[in-house]
Amino acid sequence: MRPSGRKLDQMRSVSIEPNVMKHAEGSCLIRMGETHVLCSASIEDKPPPFLKNTGLGWVTAEYGMLPRATTSRNRREAAAGKQSGRTQEIQRLIGRALRAGVDRSALGERQIVIDCDVLQADGGTRCASITGGWVALRLAVNKLLKAGIIVSDPIVDNVAAVSCGIYAGQPVLDLDYAEDSTAGTDGNFVLTGRSRMIEVQMSAEGASFSRDEMGQLLDLAEAGIAELVAAQKAALG
């Protein structure tokens, strides 16, 4: 039995509320159970220096957690004067994942920055950030298209992410914190709307896993991604 009472293949409730920020070109609030992440997309009219005069655009991400997103207060990283290794790893993952769904030549020489701020954390914050970040990105690109700033849609497919793991000896979908903190194996799966893999991160936390178990987790992830893509489409109308 899962702590939440969910079935092994059952996602947490998912909702994506678009256009929640006045100034950002794209934004949404994604809720996956008790994990809530505010995602925004900001368009910058020039690319990073390493892409100057290449005709290519860029998508990057920044990630952070509010001090009281967790059960006890975490000190702001700005107050500490540096980002943790975890934060840097997660924001690089978000950027990589979202770039995989973009034709950067169609985007042109500009950069879109995705900011993901965790309001409340209960496991799966990086996956929620990728899924919500894509919605914010899609909304920002829509504004570029509507304004005639770009003529071809650079978004080639949806991008979403979900966690899966081995909990109490059973493969489960969409781990919350109670499961994630005690899972024998856990992984993050980033897929496109067509179920093509962008990134798979799996690690044995308490017990090694078999190839068959990895396949079972991938099957769960594909089903979960399908639900998330449907939520993305519903949010966009």
Curated annotation (Swiss-Prot):
Q: Where does phosphate bind?
A: 86, 124-126
> Which top EC class is named for this enzyme in its record?
transferase
Query: Entry's PROSITE patterns?
Result: RIBONUCLEASE_PH
Q: Name one GO biological process term.
A: tRNA processing
Q: Which GO molecular function annotations are given, in alphabetical order?
A: 3'-5'-RNA exonuclease activity; tRNA binding; tRNA nucleotidyltransferase activity
For this protein, what reaction is catalysed?
tRNA(n+1) + phosphate = tRNA(n) + a ribonucleoside 5'-diphosphate
Q: Which InterPro entries match?
A: ExoRNase_PH_dom1, ExoRNase_PH_dom2, ExoRNase_PH_dom2_sf, PNPase/RNase_PH_dom_sf, Ribosomal_Su5_D2-typ_SF, RNase_PH, RNase_PH_bac-type, RNase_PH_CS
Q: Please indicate which superkingdom the organism of origin belongs to.
A: Bacteria
Entries under Pfam families matching the protein? RNase_PH (PF01138), RNase_PH_C (PF03725)
What keywords appear on the UniProt entry? Answer: Nucleotidyltransferase, RNA-binding, rRNA processing, Transferase, tRNA processing, tRNA-binding
- Give its E.C. classification number: 2.7.7.56
- Quaternary assembly: Homohexameric ring arranged as a trimer of dimers.
Q: So what does this one do?
A: Phosphorolytic 3'-5' exoribonuclease that plays an important role in tRNA 3'-end maturation. Removes nucleotide residues following the 3'-CCA terminus of tRNAs; can also add nucleotides to the ends of RNA molecules by using nucleoside diphosphates as substrates, but this may not be physiologically important. Probably plays a role in initiation of 16S rRNA degradation (leading to ribosome degradation) during starvation.
Q: Which family does it belong to?
A: Belongs to the RNase PH family.
The protein depicted here goes by the name Ribonuclease PH
User: Organism source for this protein?
Assistant: Cereibacter sphaeroides (strain KD131 / KCTC 12085)
Tell me what gene encodes this. rph
